[in-house]
Amino acid sequence: MYIIIMGLGRVGLSLANLLIDDGYDLTLIDDNESLCNEAAAELDALVICGNGTNSKLLEETNIEDADFFIATTGNDEANLLSCILVRKYDVPNIIARVSNPDHEEAFKAVGIDNVISPEITAAGFLEKLVTRPNVADLISLGEGDAEIFDMTITNDKVVGKRIKDISPTKDYIIIATYQNGKLVIPQ
């Protein structure tokens, strides 16, 4: 899978490191020469120093072969413009970082549906840590209509009981348990 990331700040570099560790083929774009030099020296990826809102530069990355284009700069306008340009190359997956949540509607108005705000995401995660301190991991589904979470149950009312005796209820369904360190999906 071929992924192009525009922006080599904290978000872009962190994402690049994770994707490289997972074995993905990356091209990284930034207009800051020192960030480009640092990334080129440290990462197993093609690094192009230039403006990601330039069509000719995007063509140099073989944008038409990309499976993903991810705009991670802290500049919403640059992210928006690059995503608009990338759409003409039929990249199947376009993701944009938005710094100002008020700008999210502008991205959606031009068909960029995958818009992420690291600040809002972090705030939501922190809120979950406060409101659900026993939850080890949490996945929200859809628009937050449902959630899957991993938690340790210490309530004497349910510990040691059969799953069919306590689930489903109107509030939850148990979909798996750990027994002796192994994941067990009930029948």
Regions found by a protein language model. Name each.
Residues 1-187:
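Cytosolic regulatory regions of ion transport systems
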